[in-house]
């Protein structure tokens, strides 16, 4: 009976428990389902707000830039949806090579971080579209973007490629009316370049981490550009100056002063003066005596205008005339190309596509320009037939692209003044003037050259006046402009003395004249080749065939960002790290570092684009040789981390040891030779002569919380940190923080950290209680849209420098913030001081 009763009780209890459990489970499930449903609904709502799917018939146009999309949308109007991809949407993965070198070079392309939503948005719009027009830029990168978008949309839709070299209503409509197929060969060319860059960078960089220091990198093109600056530095250091002399005097006739200069012992052969005694003897021979005029030569010289801008020439002239870096030039040009809001004309693209090596002008633009020149300057300034220019290295006058030019002669620099920012106005005027001058008539210059004789020694002087200015009325290239200001002759091979104002008085053969200021000798020393500046390094890369015009700005930025090159007095100087890495790469990878090899790759890429050679063959040929070189370098490249370089500088701490240069994980530093008995270390730098200067310690603004002594700012594998100066006696170590309180928890500050991939981020020190973190450096600047207390710094090729709210993504142009204004004022001051010194 007891057993039966217990059994019944157990059954009842089990039933009740099961019932309760089922109820609880049902409640939990219902709760979870409700949450999921709410999330989905919210997500859909957000998506609709972000960009609802339009109803009705429409065609879809995909471009790569939001500002370009905005301009084009206004041109096309109803019946079109325009969306931006914000640059590339797919690339090789960051976590692995992404290229199967064993299996026919299959490539693993993945969506770029943060682009998933953008891809989904394009796919959603594509579903309802009748026709899809892909309109990224007309270069290889633009073609790659178009192919990647087409792959994500799929083959079920009608997809066309549209290309235009100007963001104007006429150009865009013409492109839409005349669509073309996607260019597979051009895409193959871009893929080849990307894979070659990945193979070189991904395979060589780890060897440098092991042998030199972590975090540095090699690149197929950037390393060759580094070689240019490094070898120029070697030339400068090896240069031995040589003494030489010149003899100058001054004459004056009819109240016109002019300078004369020693030429030689005959009127036909120039004599270089290298002997001081010989020079002094000539000065003594002619002193107090008359100079007889032996010959007066007068000739009319014609000077031709130069072509409109290519990318490289624009970068060079903007550097020489405006003081712009290549990067700054391209950022400003990008905005002028994509569209500027004009008060009386709405959104307008003001210049044609700015990445080009063509000097061609479209026939309709050429016709408009000739009409403009005749109307504004008169028929004397217009040549009888258009000036024709050939692309460098080509016999063709015609090619598919155009030079950089204004899109419309309606928008004169004066017309758009007030609508453009200062940098935009300067660059637009430069492009405008160069374009107009390229189709103007020749300048005619009357030149006079006079030869004098005194005691068997010959002297010369020259003067010139502009008889007809022609194209010089509008534009003169930087080099010619400087020569013109000096009163000199910008295209004469011989450097001759000249009249200061360009004029000579009336001088006749057989006439004798005395010196107003007696001839005297001047001592000179030959100079080493100059270090590269922005203009000359772009010119050198173009002449050597290194990279493409569209890549020059990023190449120059890369070698600076990597710490291989620094800018001193507006010239590029390789750092110690840059010199070391360059020499090691040249020794271990002679083919990759060969300028001719890099130029040869560019030719192969052109052949792939023309369909003359298969892209996989190029990769196979490269890899078969490169793989062998890689294995050899792993074994034979020197390990700098194990080397000690004595400096001859006594240790400041123990005064007994000597500082040695050592290589650590973060570069070179000075360490006492008595280590471990003395742990004194210092950062240092070398000046241009190679002298070592010990840098003062960098102290943090707060004291050590443990012992009260100063905290030193140090650099480690994961970025900067602070450590007590009394280390190792006091082992206090803290993160490097910015003086900005976290707006989320209002307790922590933002600490600077570096990820395992070398990228910096800023996280709250109150972690894990507060997980606030930013990939961009925070600034204490209230967001104008949502009021959030900080904004993050960002810089992109298309939009330039900005502060962006991490919450609502609202953006403010950097130049409109107090930080940007302070930076601009500092930069302006530096540029003015450079101009004054030059």
Regions found by a protein language model. Give the residues of each.
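Conserved short loop/turn motifs at secondary-structure junctions
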Residues: 57, 137-138, 213-217, 298-307, ...
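Core structural elements
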Residues: 193-203, 221, 251-253, 301-313, ...
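Basic, low-complexity terminal or inter-domain segments flanking catalytic cores
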Residues: 2, 22, 26, 30, ...
């Amino acid at each position: 009976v007891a057993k039966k009763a217990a059994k019944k009780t157990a059954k009842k209890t089990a039933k009740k428990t099961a019932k309760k459990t089922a109820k609880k489970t049902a409640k939990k499930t219902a709760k979870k389902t409700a949450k999921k449903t709410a999330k989905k609904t919210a997500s859909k709502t957000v998506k609709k707000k972000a960009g609802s799917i339009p109803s009705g018939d429409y065609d879809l146009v995909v471009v790569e830039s939001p500002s370009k999309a905005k301009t084009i949308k206004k041109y096309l109007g109803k019946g079109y949806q325009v969306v931006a991809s914000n640059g590339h949407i797919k690339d090789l993965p960051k976590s692995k090579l992404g290229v199967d070198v064993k299996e026919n070079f299959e490539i693993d392309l993945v969506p770029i971080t943060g682009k998933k939503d953008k891809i989904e948005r394009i796919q959603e719009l594509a579903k309802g579209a009748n026709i899809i027009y892909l309109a990224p830029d007309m270069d290889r990168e633009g073609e790659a973007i178009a192919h990647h978008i087409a792959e994500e949309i799929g083959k079920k839709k009608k997809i066309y490629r549209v290309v235009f070299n100007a963001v104007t209503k006429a150009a865009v409509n013409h492109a839409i009316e005349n669509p073309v197929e996607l260019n597979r060969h051009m895409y193959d060319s871009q893929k080849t370049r990307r894979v070659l860059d990945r193979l070189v960078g991904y395979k060589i960089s780890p060897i440098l981490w092991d042998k030199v220091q972590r975090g540095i990198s090699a690149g197929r093109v950037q390393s060759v550009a580094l070689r240019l600056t490094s070898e120029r530095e070697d030339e400068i250091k090896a240069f031995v100056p040589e003494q030489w002399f010149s003899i100058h005097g001054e004459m004056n006739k009819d109240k016109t002063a002019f300078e004369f200069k020693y030429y030689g012992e005959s009127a036909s052969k120039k004599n270089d003066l290298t002997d001081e005694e010989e020079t002094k003897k000539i000065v003594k021979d002619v002193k107090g005596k008359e100079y007889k005029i032996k010959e007066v030569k007068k000739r009319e010289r014609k000077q031709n205008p130069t072509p409109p801008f290519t990318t490289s020439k624009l970068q060079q002239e903007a550097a020489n005339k405006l003081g712009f870096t290549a990067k700054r030039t391209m950022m400003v040009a990008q905005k002028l190309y994509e569209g500027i809001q004009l008060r009386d004309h709405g959104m307008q693209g003001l210049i044609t596509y700015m990445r080009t090596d063509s000097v061609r002008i479209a026939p309709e633009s050429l016709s408009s320009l000739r009409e403009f020149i005749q109307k504004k300057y008169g028929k004397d300034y217009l040549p009888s037939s258009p000036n024709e220019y050939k692309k460098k290295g080509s016999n063709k006058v015609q090619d598919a692209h155009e030079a950089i030019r204004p899109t419309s002669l309606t928008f004169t620099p004066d017309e758009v003044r007030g609508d453009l920012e200062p940098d935009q106005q300067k660059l637009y005027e430069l492009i405008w003037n160069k374009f107009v001058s390229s189709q103007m008539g020749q300048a005619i210059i009357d030149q006079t050259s006079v030869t004098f004789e005194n005691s068997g020694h010959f002297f010369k002087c020259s003067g010139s006046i502009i008889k007809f200015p022609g194209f010089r009325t509008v534009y003169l290239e930087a080099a010619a402009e400087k020569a013109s200001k000096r009163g000199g002759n910008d295209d004469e091979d011989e450097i001759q003395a000249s009249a200061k104002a360009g004029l000579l008085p009336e001088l006749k053969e057989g006439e004798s004249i005395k010196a107003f200021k007696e001839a005297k000798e001047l001592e000179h020393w030959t100079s080493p080749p100059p270090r590269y500046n922005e203009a000359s390094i772009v010119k050198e890369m173009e002449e050597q065939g290194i990279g493409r015009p569209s890549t020059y700005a990023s190449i120059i930025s890369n070698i600076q960002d990597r710490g291989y090159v620094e800018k001193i007095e507006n010239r590029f100087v390789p750092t110690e790290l840059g010199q070391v890495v360059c020499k090691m790469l040249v020794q271990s990878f002679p083919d990759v570092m060969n300028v001719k090899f890099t130029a040869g790759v560019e030719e192969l890429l052109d052949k792939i684009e023309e369909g003359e050679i298969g892209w996989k063959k190029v990769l196979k040929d490269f890899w078969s040789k490169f793989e062998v070189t890689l294995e050899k370098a792993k074994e034979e490249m020197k390990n700098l981390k194990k080397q000690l370089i004595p400096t001859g500088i006594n240790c400041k701490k123990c005064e007994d040891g000597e500082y040695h240069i050592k290589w650590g994980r973060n570069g070179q530093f000075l360490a006492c030779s008595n280590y471990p008995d003395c742990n004194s270390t210092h950062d240092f730098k070398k000046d241009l002569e190679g002298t070592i200067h010990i840098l003062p310690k960098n102290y943090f603004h707060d004291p050590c919380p443990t012992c009260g002594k100063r905290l030193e700012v140090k650099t480690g594998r994961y970025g900067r940190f602070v450590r007590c100066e009394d280390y190792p006696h006091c082992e206090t170590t803290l993160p490097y923080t910015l003086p900005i309180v976290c707006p989320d928890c209002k307790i922590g500050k933002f600490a600077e950290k570096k990820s395992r991939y070398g990228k910096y981020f800023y996280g709250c020190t109150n972690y894990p209680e507060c997980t606030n973190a930013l990939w961009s450096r925070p600034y204490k600047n209230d967001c104008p849209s949502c009021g959030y207390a900080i904004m993050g710094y960002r810089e992109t090729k298309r939009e330039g420098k900005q502060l962006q709210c991490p919450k609502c993504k609202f953006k403010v142009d950097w130049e409109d913030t107090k930080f940007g204004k302070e930076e601009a004022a500092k930069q302006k001051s530096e540029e003015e001081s450079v101009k004054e010194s030059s």
